Regions:
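Glycine-rich anion-binding surface patch
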Residues: 1-125
Length: 125
């Protein structure tokens, strides 16, 4: 949001997705027993319904028009299989949205570091 509302870019971010993202749309519900300070309890969680192999070849490429330029500056493709830290449950329910967000963050660090000004999210610290 900081980048999009700054004058560093003209317009909005652009996205290119590659691969068959339909492979990563299934989720499943599991029930697990956990131990807490008050004893054992059961939790229900939503987990991904796809394998690591299903993620191979899936990527997003993020780009934007930098101030003073007329063409889109595209970042490098970001592959889903290469994303290790997935702290949000949205990685299970909406991986395309999450990888797009991560792609914008990487793009901004590379092409507009002056806008970020050293601000880091908790998973980057």
């Amino acid at each position: 949001a900081v980048i999009a509302s700054s004058s560093a870019i003209h317009g909005r971010f652009h996205y290119r997705y590659g691969g068959d993202w339909e492979r990563c749309t299934r989720t499943q519900e599991i029930t697990r027993d956990k131990n807490g300070k008050n004893g054992k309890y059961t939790v229900t969680e939503r987990v991904r319904g796809w394998t690591d192999e299903d993620e191979i070849g899936l990527f997003v490429q993020v780009g934007a028009i930098l101030r003073g330029e007329s063409e889109i500056t595209w970042g490098e493709p970001l592959y889903l299989s290469g994303v290790v830290t997935r702290n949000s449950p949205l990685w299970v329910s909406n991986p395309k949205q999450q990888i797009a967000y991560l792609g914008v963050k990487y793009w901004a660090r590379l092409y507009c570091p002056e806008v970020i000004l050293g601000v880091y999210s908790p998973d980057e610290v």
